[in-house]
């Protein structure tokens, strides 16, 4: 898909927001939802999305951008405390040529560990029990 075009309400994140698809939730408020990536590049790979519909960063309301990145910082700190990675990659893609695969604005929080290579984007599906355990650890730090 190109960088520009109409928002498609049948994307997986829109379905998650409507409750039509499940997710392993990490955080939610009136404007933001965060959940575990089911095709993680590393242990603890978390996604953060605005609830308002937008295809990409360029089309997202500036107020939602502020809320989104405030939440990304807060959740990244919780990931750091919960999982003790050696680094954290914050990634955001716009348009298919840039690597965007779901056309709803989202940010990846990808913990990085010394000596462990990142998996490929969309590689293997994670074990749901493991994702739930990771989400619980992150949520505990958010609530601390």
Regions found by a protein language model. Give the residues of each.
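HIT superfamily nucleotide-processing domains
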Residues: 1-144
């Amino acid at each position: 898909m190109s960088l520009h075009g109409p928002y498609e309400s049948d994307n997986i994140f829109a379905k998650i927001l409507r409750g039509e698809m499940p997710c392993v939730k990490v955080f939610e408020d009136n404007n933001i939802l965060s959940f575990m990536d089911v095709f993680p590049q590393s242990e603890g790979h978390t996604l953060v999305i605005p609830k308002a519909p937008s295809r990409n960063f360029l089309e997202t309301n500036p107020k939602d951008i502020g809320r989104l990145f405030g939440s990304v910082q807060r959740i990244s700190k919780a990931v750091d405390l919960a999982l003790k990675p050696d680094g954290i990659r914050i990634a955001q893609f716009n348009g298919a040529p840039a690597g965007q695969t779901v056309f709803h604005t989202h940010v990846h929080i990808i913990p990085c560990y010394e000596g462990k290579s990142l998996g490929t984007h969309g590689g293997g599906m994670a074990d749901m029990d493991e994702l739930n355990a990771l989400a619980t650890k992150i949520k505990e730090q958010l609530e601390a």
